[in-house]
């Protein structure tokens, strides 16, 4: 009887762990979607265009010398030190909006998502007593979720900070 109870308790615990891991995985997948779809963007530590900007919710607008990158949608975080530092309220708000519009509602609270991300080992760092890290961004200190960058985007080496425009194939008269 004790062995059966222990097995049931372990099975129930595993269901909880699996559910939290799947919530964390869904959160990451939805985060990738909102960035790729242009519903949100992530800036560098100072609020400007980051490396890997196209994968982080930025797009090129304008042409020629007037071409520039612009963040799309709401700013939900910052990227530096190989981490994405997310504002939990902003990120969950945008992600919830997408998840409910596609019929796959992410109903978890910010706190339960942060806990699920921590338990799934998806947080790069967090304070000992909370699932957030106090971080300085854009001249202010705030508590943010710190995710490993490689969970959200693939990195094949350092990208150029700004786009390289290739005019070699153009017929430019001088």
Where on the chain are the PLM-derived regions?
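Extended alpha-helical interface modules used as scaffolds for assembling large macromolecular complexes
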Residues: 1-174
């Amino acid at each position: 009887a004790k062995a059966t109870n222990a097995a049931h308790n372990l099975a129930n615990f595993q269901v909880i762990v699996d559910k939290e891991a799947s919530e964390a995985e869904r959160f990451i997948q939805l985060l990738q979607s909102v960035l790729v779809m242009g519903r949100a963007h992530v800036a560098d530590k100072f609020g400007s265009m980051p490396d890997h900007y196209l994968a982080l919710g930025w797009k090129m607008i304008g042409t020629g010398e007037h071409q520039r990158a612009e963040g799309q949608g709401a700013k939900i975080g910052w990227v530096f030190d190989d981490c994405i530092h997310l504002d939990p309220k902003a990120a969950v708000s945008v992600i919830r909006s997408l998840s409910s519009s596609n019929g796959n509602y992410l109903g978890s609270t910010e706190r339960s998502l942060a806990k699920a991300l921590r338990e799934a080992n998806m947080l790069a760092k967090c304070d000992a007593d909370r699932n957030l890290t106090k971080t300085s961004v854009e001249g202010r200190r705030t508590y943010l979720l710190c995710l490993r960058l490689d969970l959200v985007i693939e990195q094949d080496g350092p990208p150029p900070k700004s786009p390289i425009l290739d005019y070699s194939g153009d017929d430019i008269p001088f």
